[in-house]
Amino acid sequence: MCGIVGYIGRREALPVLMDGLQRLEYRGYDSAGVALVAGGRTWVEKRKGRLSDLQTVLGNLPSGCRVGIGHTRWATHGRPSDRNAHPHTDTSGRFAVVHNGIIENYAELRAELERQGCVFRSETDTEVIPHLIASCYDGDLVRAVRRAVPRLRGAYAIAVVCQQEPDKIVAVRAASPLVIGLGEGELLLASDIPALLPYTRQVIVMEEGWLAELTPEGVTLTTVAGEPVQPQVMRVDWEPGQAERGGYAHFMLKEIHEQPRALRDTLTGRLDAATGLVTLSEVGLSAAEVRALRKVAMVACGTAAHAGLVGRYLIERLAGIPVEWDLASEYRYREPLVDEHTLFVAVSQSGETADTLAALREARSRGARVLAVTNVVGSTVAREADWVLYTWAGPEIAVASTKAYSTQVVALTLLAIWLGQQNGRIDPAEASALVSGLQHLPDQAGQTLSLEAAVKEAAEALAGHDDVFFIGRNLDYAVALEAQLKLKEISYIHAEAYAAGELKHGPLALITDGVPVVALNTQPDLAEKTISNIQETRARGAFVLGLAQEGDEETARHCDRIFYLPRTHRLLTPALAVIPMQLLAYYAATARGTDVDKPRNLAKSVTVE
C-alpha cells in the first residue's frame, strides 16, 4: 500500500517529507518521490528503489520550500520504474499529484485525455488525475479538484499541489485513508499516523468523500460536493512502533484485520452484478482457447499452495477442467506432463519464491501457458508469466501470511468462475449467486472478525497443549491445512491437518483424553460425514472446537465449543473460515510469548531452493 505525506508551514518542507516517508517504510514500497512548489514552478524528483536512491537526486531541488508532497509507491499499474514513480504531473508540469489506490476507469479517461492532446509519460492509472485536474482548472484548484474527482471510479486518496497556487495542498479521500496533522503554525498530511507523530499529536482522520484544503491559514474540510463537515480532532498517544502497526500489538494482527479491505481491493473492477459475470481483462485467453484447455496445473509453496488447493477444487467444480495440484518444490522431479493445452497457474505472494519460479520455467519449457497469481507488481513471477492476476493485498510485513492467503483464495475463485463462463460449463444461476456472494464477502469478513474475543479465549486454553489436530473435508480440508501451518509456525505447537475421512487410517491412534481437535464443517453437503468423524474423536476423549456456518445447530451439538461464520455460498467459505483460524494461531502464540511477526528459522520470501 502506497504512502502519502504532505507539508505546509513554517519549516522547510523537504526534510519533513523525507522523514514522513521514512516512517511509512513499514508499509512496503518499490519507488519514492517528492514534489515541491516554489519560485513559480513545481519541482519533482522521483526514483525507483529505496529512499536512499531518492536521496541521491534531492540536490536538484531548491532549498527553502515550505510546501510539498511525497510518496512511496507499491506498484499496481505499471512496473516499478523512475517514470512510474509518484508524484505525477500534467503535460505542462503545473500540477503534481500523489495517489494511493486504484482508478478503475483510467483506460477510458486516458484515451479521452490523449485525444485532447495530453501527453502521458508513465504506465500508471495515477497519471490521469493531474491531466484531468488541469483540464478542469480555471484559476481555482479546489474547484478543479471538485470537478475532476467525480469522474474517477475506484478507491483512492490523493494530494495535489499547483504552481499557480503555491501555498495550498488539496486532498481527497475515497475509500483509502488520509490523516491531517495539526501542528503549531504548520499542517501535515499522511496516509497513516506514524508520519505525523514527530510534529504533532493532534490529528483529524478524514472521512469518506471529504475534501481538505490546506493553507498557511489552516485547514478547510468539506465534502467533494462542497458541503460543510464537522471534523473531530483527536489526540494520539501511541509510541512510534505501535503507530506503525496502526495501534495493533503486532503486524500480523493488523494484517488479519486488514482482510475486509484487502478482499474488497481484490474484487474491485472484476465483478459485474448486473450481468452476474466475472471480468478478468488481464487474462488474455479467448473463449476458444479456454475450451481447448485439457488441464490446469496449480503450483505453489506453503500458504500459497493451500490457496492453490482451494483453487483446484473450485476450477474442477465450476469450469469442469481437470486440475493437477503440486508443491512447487516437488514439481520438477516427477517429469510433469504439460503441453500447449495446459494452463500453468503459479501462486506466490512475493513473486520471488525460488521453487515456484523453477516450476514455472519447467512448465514453460514444455509449452504450457502461464498465469501468475501474485501480490507484487514487477516481481519475477509476474515478468515471466504470460498473464498476471494481481491480488492487491497490499504489503504484508509479518512473516506468517494472512491477507495474502485470503486474497489468493478470492483471486482463484474469480478465475474458476471466469473459466467456467468462458467455456460454458458453469450454470449461469450459480455464477450469479457466486458473484452476489463475492460482493458481500468483504463485509462478512468484517463480521467474522467479531469472533476475536471468543477465539482468543479458546486459543489461550489451547496454548498449553503440545499437539493440535485439524480436520475437514473438501474445501474445509484445504483451510485446515492452512490453519495447522499458521499454528505451528508462530506458536511452535505441533499441529497436523487431516482430511476427516482419513482419521481411521492412522491419525485416530493419536487422539486421547483432552487432545484438542479443530473440526471445520462449513460444507452442508458433507456435514453429516464430518459430524461422524467428530463423534469418532470425542469418543476417544478429544476436546473439539467446531467451525460451521451460522445456524448449524447439529454441528454445535457434537462440539465442546463452536464458532459460527456468516452464512454464505458454500464455495466461498474458505476466505471467511481462515480468519478465526488465523486468530486462533495468533492468540495461542501471544499466550506462549513467541515472536509473532518474526518466528524462528523462517523468512517472508523464500528465494533459495
Swiss-Prot record:
It comes from the Bacteria. Keywords: Aminotransferase, Cytoplasm, Glutamine amidotransferase, Repeat, Transferase. CDD domains: GFAT, SIS_GlmS_GlmD_1, SIS_GlmS_GlmD_2. Pfam families: GATase_6, SIS. It is an enzyme of class 2 (transferase). It is found in: Cytoplasm. Transmembrane segments: none annotated. The keyword RNA-binding does not apply. The keyword Cytoplasm applies. The active site is at residues 2, 604. PROSITE patterns: GATASE_TYPE_2, SIS. GO terms for cellular component: cytosol. Gene3D superfamilies: Glucose-6-phosphate isomerase like protein, domain 1, Glutamine Phosphoribosylpyrophosphate, subunit 1, domain 1. Its main location: cytoplasm. GO terms for molecular function: carbohydrate derivative binding; glutamine-fructose-6-phosphate transaminase (isomerizing) activity. Homodimer. NCBIfam families: glmS (TIGR01135), PRK00331.1 (NF001484). Catalyzes the first step in hexosamine metabolism, converting fructose-6P into glucosamine-6P using glutamine as a nitrogen source. HAMAP family: GlmS. This is Glutamine--fructose-6-phosphate aminotransferase [isomerizing]. It comes from Symbiobacterium thermophilum (strain DSM 24528 / JCM 14929 / IAM 14863 / T). The lineage of its organism: Bacteria, Bacillati, Bacillota, Clostridia, Eubacteriales.
